Structures are given as C-alpha cells and as structure tokens.
C-alpha cells in the first residue's frame, strides 16, 4: 500500500493560498484595485519566496491589478504574518495566471469546430472530389 507523501511546502502553500485569498480580497477593495482572486501559490523549498498566481475578473485590467498587488506586497505579507503561525513568512511575488484565459480560448475554438459540424467539408476536399 503506497501512501502519498506531503511535503511541508505543499501544506504551507495551501495555507498561504487560503489566508492570502481573504487578505487580497479585502486589500483590493481598500486600495481600489481591479478585482482578483488567488488561484495558486508555489513556495520555494526554503520557504523564503512565494509565487502568488492571481486571475483578474477583468482581463483587460490584469496588468494594473498585478502592479497594484506588487506595490502593496509588503503590507500583504505583514497581514499574512499575523494570520499564520510561521516563524518566517515568505516574500510574496505576484504573477498573472493566464490559464483561465487560455482555457476560454481553447473552449471557443472547440465550440467553433462544433458549429462547423461533421458533415461540412473544406474547399480543398471539394476540389479533390471533382
């Protein structure tokens, strides 16, 4: 029976994602930033750095949102330190997570293929059949 091993970094990143999600939600409102949500957190093995991936509800304002979060990263880290019981809270590095945008683009492409339908042929196939 194989047991799945969990590393401390996995547990800490999950906790950071939960706590930081709440903190970022409040900070966005307080600082007038575009609305974002924390989608993932990757923490270095030494727990010194955390890559925080965020998604913006308004894609066109994503750069503004990430810049605003980078500007207040120190404040967010202080609030995170109060919420978590860690000796050392990782330094926060914010990045835009474009996986949702890429997923929507792929979904739209697949939907367009469905609209063409299985009975439709391209002009190249029509030329070959003649």
Curated annotation (Swiss-Prot):
* Database matches in Pfam families: RBFA
Compartment(s):
Cytoplasm
Key word Cytoplasm present: yes
Residue span of region Disordered = 111-130
Q: Does the keyword Cytoplasm apply?
A: yes
Kindly report the protein's main subcellular placement as a broad class.
cytoplasm
Q: Name one GO molecular function term.
A: ribosomal small subunit binding
**Which GO terms fall under biological process for this protein?**
maturation of SSU-rRNA
Q: Give me the disulphide-bonded residues.
A: none
Q: Which UniProt keywords apply?
A: Cytoplasm, Ribosome biogenesis
InterPro entries on file? KH_dom-like_a/b, RbfA, RbfA_dom_sf, Ribosome-bd_factorA_CS
Instruction: Give the record's GO CC terms.
Output: cytosol
Give the multimer and partner information: Monomer. Binds 30S ribosomal subunits, but not 50S ribosomal subunits or 70S ribosomes.
Q: Which HAMAP family match?
A: RbfA (MF_00003)
Family, according to the entry, reads as follows: Belongs to the RbfA family.
Protein purpose: One of several proteins that assist in the late maturation steps of the functional core of the 30S ribosomal subunit. Associates with free 30S ribosomal subunits (but not with 30S subunits that are part of 70S ribosomes or polysomes). Required for efficient processing of 16S rRNA. May interact with the 5'-terminal helix region of 16S rRNA.
Protein name (record): Ribosome-binding factor A
What is the protein's species of origin? Xanthomonas oryzae pv. oryzae (strain KACC10331 / KXO85)
